[in-house]
Design a protein with these regions (language model features):
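Short loop/turn motifs at secondary-structure junctions and domain boundaries
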Residues: 5-8
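N-terminal targeting or regulatory segments adjacent to alpha/beta-hydrolase or S9 domains
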Residues: 1-3
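Alpha/beta-hydrolase superfamily serine-hydrolase fold, recognizing
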Residues: 10-207
Length: 207
């Protein structure tokens, strides 16, 4: 395994105006270099768990290894705040950061949206829902093992890898059901939770 050393993470706290109050975020940057690309990162956790603390070591390492500044964005979690609270927060954060890009670096005044698992889902949703002004400022997306569709799509992996993994099929059922709350996949408005079903995939930035 890897035997390297990670320096203690250092970051600056941010508060971003959100649809239901402040959205908390952390910026990992090298203040001696303001011309680095800027990654906006959404943490994973099935839209139910995870926060800024759980992903601080990763975001710090991402900053160190990529040569990019990184803003890690928190968002409201289910069950207290079911869909669409999370994508609403993430889209609002992306808009605000893009509008204030001059305060955070950004080598070409553009951002890269990124995330893992549920966070990758939210990054893709934000890219798909970006208005023209925001879309011009998104240079790309980085999606790490993204959750792109509901379990009712019947993908073979839900059977082939149902057990024996840390993330079992039952966990995925729980995460999706908790996230959607009283909504069902076919309900009006629920489609935005499933980026793989979008008819606008060709509009996504380089991925």
């Amino acid at each position: 395994g890897w035997k390297g050393h990670i320096d203690s993470p250092s970051w600056n706290a941010l508060e971003i105006p959100g649809p239901a109050g402040p959205i908390h975020a952390r910026m990992f940057s090298d203040h001696s270099r303001d011309d680095r690309p800027l990654i906006v990162y959404f943490h994973g956790g099935g839209w139910v768990i995870g926060d800024l603390d759980t992903h601080t070591p990763f975001c710090h390492l991402l900053h160190q290894r990529s040569g990019c500044n990184v803003i890690s964005v928190d968002y409201r979690l289910a069950p207290e705040h079911p869909f669409p609270a999370a994508p609403d927060d993430c889209l609002a954060a992306a808009h605000w950061i893009a509008e204030h890009i001059g305060d955070f670096g950004g080598s070409d005044h553009r951002i890269i949206l990124a995330g893992d698992s549920a966070g990758a889902n939210l990054a893709s949703v934000a890219c798909l829902e970006a208005d023209p002004a925001l879309r011009e400022k998104i240079a790309g997306e980085i999606i790490i093992y993204p959750v792109t569709d509901h379990y009712n799509a019947g993908f073979p992996s839900y059977v082939e890898r149902a057990k024996g993994q840390t993330l079992t099929a039952n966990f995925m059922f729980m995460f999706w059901d908790t996230y959607l709350g009283e909504r069902r996949p076919g309900d009006p408005g629920a489609a935005r939770a499933f980026p793989l079903r979008s008819q606008q995939l060709a509009t996504l930035p380089p991925t």
